[in-house]
């Protein structure tokens, strides 16, 4: 069993009693699920239900790091705020976007800096943009409606969870790490690898999409090889994702050398920095909504773009070496590196 499978089963069991309060009866399932993912991070992140009113109301939950829990006989530190933001939890009947637009969430955002809004079946992370205004950062819905959600969970919670386990785990960990200042290459690599793994999953699910053939041709011509058979198909999809995400990172590295610290990077317009024609061709095809909209790669590249714009450049480049770019951006979980270092080296050429 997995954390998400357990979450769905717990929700189902509480629902099946017929005696549950729509919102609060399920708090424990949210706490258990988020703690299961939080303990995999360093430092660990732990969910605490119902925080004190510090002036903005009583959040349904807050996300604290391990260092915030006082050890030994010392008294707890008074007035601590959760380092990784808070949560606003409503019943499955509520709409996440309407919850997000509420005055209460606005107060939490101003006070805590980040709010995870959820109705147990749909998750939305809200943060602040460069001007301090509310911004919807990432969203993860399990179903389009309350009825559909309960139907799936009650029919087979494990099978339903299996559809989302990897991608949701990546999402919830990104939620916990959103507030962390990005100064280390390995932290940036974690975020980009997280989006890359999710992108690879999406491409795997859409492997029969005819529009992928155009991308295949572009890569085959660039690499001087042909993707054949099942192994070739796997290598093609892995190489596609690596090319896109390494490309966007490499473009950011070169772009950063020429632009002021307060300017914002845009992966769509900065790809020419790489001076690699195949990257420009790939980006054009991926960004073309009529061709590859179903893949969802544009949204994942947009999220990666936001990560790059969060980097504290001066500190980052003190620790970063271009010669180690491939090492820093090691996309695990089945992404093949065969023949790929040549492409990366070309991307980083000024």
Regions of interest found by a model, annotated:
Residues 1-41, 45-50, 247, 266-269, ...:
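Charged, often low-complexity linker/regulatory segments
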Residues 2-6, 211-227, 327-348:
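Active-site-adjacent bridging/hinge elements
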Residues 24, 28, 99-102, 213, ...:
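Conserved structured core elements
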Residues 30-33, 37, 59-63, 85-87:
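Central hydrophobic cores of alpha-helical transmembrane segments in multi-pass inner-membrane proteins
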Residues 41-80:
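Active-site metal-binding core of divalent-cation-utilizing nuclease and nuclease-like domains
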Residues 53-55, 63-67, 90-94, 333-336:
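Short, flexible loop/turn elements at secondary-structure junctions
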Residues 66, 71-298:
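Charged, often flexible domain-edge or linker segments that flank or initiate folded functional domains
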Residues 257, 261, 272, 279, ...:
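Class I S-adenosyl-L-methionine
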């Amino acid at each position: 069993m997995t954390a998400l499978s357990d979450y769905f089963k717990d929700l189902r069991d509480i629902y099946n009693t017929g005696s549950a309060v729509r919102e609060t009866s399920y708090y424990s399932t949210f706490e258990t699920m988020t703690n299961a993912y939080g303990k995999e991070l360093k430092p660990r992140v732990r969910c605490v239900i119902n925080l004190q009113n510090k002036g903005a109301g009583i959040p349904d939950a807050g996300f604290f790091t391990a260092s915030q829990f006082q050890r030994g006989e010392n008294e707890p530190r008074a007035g601590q705020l959760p380092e990784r933001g808070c949560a606003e939890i409503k019943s499955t009947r509520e709409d996440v976007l309407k919850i997000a637009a509420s005055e209460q969430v606005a107060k939490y955002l101003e006070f805590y800096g980040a709010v995870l809004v959820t109705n147990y079946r749909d998750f939305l992370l809200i943060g602040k943009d460069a001007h301090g205004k509310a911004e919807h950062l990432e969203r993860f819905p399990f179903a389009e409606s309350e009825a559909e959600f309960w139907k799936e969970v009650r029919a087979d919670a494990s099978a339903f969870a299996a559809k989302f386990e990897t991608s949701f785990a990546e999402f919830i960990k990104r939620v916990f790490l959103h507030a962390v200042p990005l100064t280390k290459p390995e932290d940036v690599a974690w975020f980009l690898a997280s989006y890359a793994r999710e992108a690879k999953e999406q491409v795997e699910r859409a492997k029969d999409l005819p529009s992928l053939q155009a991308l295949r041709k572009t890569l085959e011509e660039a690499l001087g090889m042909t993707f054949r058979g099942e192994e070739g198909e796997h290598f093609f999809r892995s190489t596609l994702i690596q090319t896109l995400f390494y490309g966007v990172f490499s473009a950011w590295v070169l772009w950063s050398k020429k632009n002021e610290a307060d300017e914002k990077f845009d992966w769509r317009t900065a790809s020419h920095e790489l001076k690699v024609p195949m990257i420009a061709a790939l980006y054009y095809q991926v960004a073309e909504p009529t061709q590859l909209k179903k893949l969802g790669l544009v949204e994942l590249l947009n999220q990666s773009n936001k990560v790059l714009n969060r980097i504290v450049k001066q500190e980052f480049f003190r620790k970063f070496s271009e010669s180690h770019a491939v090492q820093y951006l090691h996309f695990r979980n089945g992404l093949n590196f065969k023949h790929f270092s040549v492409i990366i080296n070309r991307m980083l050429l000024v």
